[in-house]
């Protein structure tokens, strides 16, 4: 299955494994974002599109124009131009500046907002969040692979879906995990370290890194910069990062370095 904007993604991603969940990053002083693409000038305040269905064109360089349809999940408070989007038929959550990115064309907000759905098992949903899990995927050949990951939160807007990330592929995904659990394709790992309360001393406050600019050194010596856009409530040391050169949302257990 093709992935939005020519990028590889999980479920759709090959799941060959890339990266890990715990990295060291360096906080850097806030500065102008690197211009990886052209952006439109800021205009007057726009309507709130969170919870709306959208469709738009996408054209990057000499690539052909393609059309995409999806649901706007969230508007990032520390960068209100940035929206989190779940595109139809794809499992990754994407971050795009919908009104500013000139690769986006003919953005249309569709008439009906996404209707709220009833959670089939609220108790299981509460137990699942913040837990390490093994998630089973079936390959095209019919074999099954187990992927260890962590359930991060119940997704906004599409509330029968859950945010999840994987040790070998630390990108933000979302699936209907209650269904997977009942089908035997998701197993909650009984690990005492999974409790967020076990990570804190009584009265301890974990400083938030949300809004901080970060620099990430890759294995090949190159560096990429980005912004911490969200702290996971169930695991306060875990954050979402949006890098300047990518529209995937990365999930890392951050270790602050000087």
Curated annotation (Swiss-Prot):
The lineage of its organism: Eukaryota, Metazoa, Chordata, Craniata, Vertebrata. Residues 50-99 are annotated as: Tudor-like domain 1. Residues 129-178 are annotated as: Tudor-like domain 2. InterPro entries: SPIN/Ssty, SPIN/Ssty_sf. GO terms for biological process: gamete generation. Belongs to the SPIN/STSY family. Residues 210-255 are annotated as: Tudor-like domain 3. The record marks 169, 176, 180 as: Histone H3K4me3 and H3R8me2a binding. Residues 1-23 are annotated as: Disordered. It comes from Pongo abelii. It comes from the Eukaryota. One of its GO terms (molecular function) is methylated histone binding. Residues 138, 246-248 are annotated as: Histone H3K4me3 and H3R8me2a binding. Interacts with C11orf84/SPINDOC. Exhibits H3K4me3-binding activity. This is Spindlin-3. It holds the Pfam family Spin-Ssty.
């Amino acid at each position: 299955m093709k992935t939005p904007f020519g990028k590889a993604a999980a479920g759709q991603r090959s799941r060959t494994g890339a990266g890990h969940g715990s990295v060291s990053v360096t906080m850097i002083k806030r500065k102008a974002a690197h211009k990886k693409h052209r952006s439109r000038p800021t205009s007057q305040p726009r309507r709130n599109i969170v919870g709306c269905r959208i469709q738009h064109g996408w054209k990057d360089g000499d690539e052909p124009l393609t059309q995409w349809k999806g649901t706007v999940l969230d508007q990032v408070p520390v960068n209100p131009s940035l929206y989190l989007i779940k595109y139809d038929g794809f499992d990754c959550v994407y971050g795009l500046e919908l009104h500013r990115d000139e690769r986006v064309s003919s953005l249309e907000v569709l008439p009906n907002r996404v209707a709220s759905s009833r959670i089939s098992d609220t108790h299981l949903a509460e137990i699942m969040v913040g837990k390490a899990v093994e998630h089973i995927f079936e390959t095209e050949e019919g074999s099954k692979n187990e992927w260890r990951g962590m359930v991060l939160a119940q997704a906004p807007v599409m509330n029968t879906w859950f945010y999840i990330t994987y040790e070998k592929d630390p990108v933000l995904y979302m699936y209907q995990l209650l269904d997977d659990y009942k089908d035997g394709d998701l197993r909650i790992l009984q690990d005492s370290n999974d409790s967020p309360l076990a990570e804190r001393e009584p009265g301890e406050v974990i400083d938030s890194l949300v809004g901080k600019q970060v620099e990430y050194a890759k294995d090949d010596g190159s560096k990429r910069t980005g912004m911490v856009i969200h702290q996971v409530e169930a695991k306060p040391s875990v954050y979402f990062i949006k890098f300047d050169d990518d529209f995937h949302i990365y999930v890392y257990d951050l270790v602050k370095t000087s």
